[in-house]
Amino acid sequence: MKPNSEEEEELVQGVGPWDECFEVAVQLALRAGQIIRKALTEEKHVSTKTSAADLVTETDHRVEDLIVSELRKRFPSHRFIAEEATASGAKCVLTHSPTWIIDPIDGTCNFVHRFPTVAVSIGFAVHQELEFGVIHHCTEERLYTGRRGQGAFCNGQRLQVSRETDLAKALVLTEIGPKRDPDTLKVFLSNMERLLHAKAHGVRVIGSSTLALCYLASGAADAYYQFGLHCWDLAAATVIIREAGGIVIDTSGGPLDLMSCRVVAAGTREMAVLIAQALQTINYGRDDEK
């Protein structure tokens, strides 16, 4: 369902020092969604990055260039962390400066195959604290937003996480990550097996970490975990989950480290701890050390 003009106006209004930034992020996410929807049906030129499963297309670059160039015009003193720029060698460092954290297409493999779970993700941090997140589910025209202290919404409707605390009643989401070597796959499958042995209702992989986290924020799932995601996958969604009443932590059970390439999120702390305790770690290094 596409947000109507009244809903868009409600989404971009607010009280706080970053209102203009939020408004621009919403409009850019909607513009990016139009580009992606059109490109979804067209022939794509696909290349790989870190592995055969880590894909990039010309649309990833086009959308990232649009978002970053427009933001630079409006906010020339701000810093940027963006997926494709980082893949090309840009340093991934979160400072105290106002910083935009951008994934132009989350779910690129889905996009290549025309599987309709694809999103644009724009996060914003100041003094290393996440202020807001905007995620546009392009194919369904769902706009997820969260602002620190102001709640989380989808097309203007307030989001609320599940309050489930029993793993045996939980639907858990995850993603595979780009590593596909035998040892990594063994641990990935073992983690799923542990949760299923604990009688979880199910474990799902949808091909987009940002949208999986949005589904968690909306109460459609009870928990999410992953090794191998990046700060641009996580930044916007973290604000949305927290503002929907959920918790986002490290897989060790400690506080979230945005650069650690690992996460557990849930509607309740009890659920997050249960998931974290069940997991065996897969080491992907850190975003700020690559």
UniProtKB/Swiss-Prot annotation:
**Main localization, broad class:** cytoplasm
Question: Where does the record place it?
Answer: Cytoplasm
Its required cofactor(s), as named, are: Mg(2+)
Fetch the Pfam families from UniProt.
Inositol_P
Per its UniProt record, what InterPro entries does this chain match? IMPase (IPR033942), Inositol_monoP_metal-BS (IPR020583), Inositol_monoPase_Li-sen (IPR020552), Inositol_monophosphatase-like (IPR000760), Inositol_monophosphatase_CS (IPR020550)
**Superkingdom, natural source:** Eukaryota
Chain segments annotated as transmembrane: none
Q: Where along this sequence does the record place binding of Mg(2+) 1?
A: 83, 103, 105
Q: Which UniProt keywords apply?
A: Cytoplasm, Hydrolase, Lithium, Magnesium, Metal-binding
Q: Which Gene3D superfamilies match?
A: 3.40.190.80, Fructose-1,6-Bisphosphatase, subunit A, domain 1
Q: What is its EC number?
A: 3.1.3.25
GO cellular-component term (any)? cytoplasm
Q: Where does substrate bind?
A: 83, 105-108, 207-209, 226, 233
The pathway noted for it is: Polyol metabolism; myo-inositol biosynthesis; myo-inositol from D-glucose 6-phosphate: step 2/2
GO:BP terms for this protein? inositol biosynthetic process; inositol metabolic process; phosphatidylinositol phosphate biosynthetic process; response to lithium ion; signal transduction
Tell whether Kinase is among the UniProt keywords.
no
User: What is the purpose of this protein?
Assistant: Can use myo-inositol monophosphates, scylloinositol 1,4-diphosphate, glucose-1-phosphate, beta-glycerophosphate, and 2'-AMP as substrates. Has been implicated as the pharmacological target for lithium Li(+) action in brain.
Membership in a protein family: Belongs to the inositol monophosphatase superfamily.
Query: What does the subunit section of this Swiss-Prot or TrEMBL entry state?
Result: Homodimer.
- Name under which the protein is recorded: Inositol monophosphatase 2
Organism of this sequence:
Rattus norvegicus (Rat)
